[in-house]
A protein has these predicted regions:
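Ligand-binding cleft/hinge of the Venus flytrap
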Residues: 69-73, 82-95, 135-137, 158-161, ...
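Extended ligand-binding regions for polar small-molecule ligands
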Residues: 24-46, 82-91, 151-174, 178, ...
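Extracytoplasmic small-molecule ligand-binding "clamshell" domains
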Residues: 23-123, 127-131, 185-189, 196-197
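A ligand-binding cleft/hinge motif common to bilobed small-molecule-binding domains
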Residues: 105, 109, 120-132, 197-233
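Bacterial N-terminal signal peptides
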Residues: 6-16
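Positively charged n-region of N-terminal signal peptides that target proteins for export
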Residues: 1-5
Length: 260
């Protein structure tokens, strides 16, 4: 009886620590862009490494941001990231598998447990890393953008007056807001769409967000009512590959491809 009890505890613990315990979806990489392979010369060492590892498992985590990743299809991974990964797969002769986790911590745990080879971070991701990890050069670079309504004359790009400004709850640009609009009344929204709609309705005078997701949302929903009035050339954000520091060959290959 005691032996059975011990075995049941051990099995339960093993299951709780298994990869299946992660809140993870394996997605099909899907690209809608015409892919022409990059002329990417490989050393003999790199060719041998690729031959030994024909599959690259990439981890990501939610929430993703459109158009960097489209969230309409729960079975496939599409968007700017997917186009880039498809180009890399085609150029290097790799099969790329996407594993999407619910949280960043789950993705980091999967990387530490070797369930994935690398992580592709969020664009708003911080640059600081935990010990034992390396990061690649940036894939995408984004900048803060200031949006106003087309219905009214162009308002000032900086003022000490009280203005109303919208941004999303995960906004990373409060330092810029403080510099440009120190007396702004800021309202936070769950999405770019909701925040931008508040400028259309006149509830807010301005919106600040990154140029990629903001530009996509305006072109899709608000092209007749909103305009990007200014790009702030500071506080740029990136997304990067993250690898374990015991995978130097992978880290170097990813960096070389980004710079190709």
């Amino acid at each position: 009886m005691a032996v059975r009890l011990i075995l049941s505890v051990v099995v339960g613990l093993a299951l709780s620590l298994s990869p299946a315990a992660y809140a993870m979806k394996q997605l099909e990489l899907k690209s809608h862009s015409h892919i022409a392979a990059i002329d990417f010369p490989l050393s003999g060492k790199e060719k041998a490494w690729l031959a030994a590892q024909p599959t690259l498992t990439v981890g990501t985590w939610l929430p993703e941001r459109t158009p960097i990743v489209y969230d309409g299809d729960e079975k496939s991974y599409q968007g700017i990231n997917a186009d880039y990964l498809a180009l890399m797969a085609h150029s290097l002769g790799l099969k790329v598998i996407i594993r999407q986790y619910d949280t960043e911590q789950q993705a980091l745990t999967a990387l530490a447990d070797r369930q994935v080879d690398t992580l592709l971070t969020q664009v708003a991701h911080r640059d600081a890393l935990a010990p034992g990890l390396d990061q690649s050069a940036p894939l995408l670079k984004t900048w803060p953008t200031l949006v106003t309504s087309l219905k009214s004359p162009l308002p000032p790009l900086t003022t000490d007056r009280r203005v109303t400004l919208a941004c999303t709850r995960d906004c990373a640009f409060f330092d810029i807001i403080q510099q440009a609009f120190p007396n702004a009344k800021i309202t936070l929204y769950d999405s770019d769409y909701q925040a931008l709609a508040s400028v259309v309705s006149g509830e807010n005078q301005y919106f600040i967000g990154n140029n990629i997701t903001t530009g996509h949302c305006i072109s899709k929903y608000f092209s007749q009512s909103l305009v990007i009035a200014h790009y702030f050339r500071q506080q740029e954000q990136h997304n990067r590959f993250v690898t374990r520091d015991d995978r130097p060959e992978l880290h170097q290959l990813l960096d070389r491809f980004i710079h190709a």
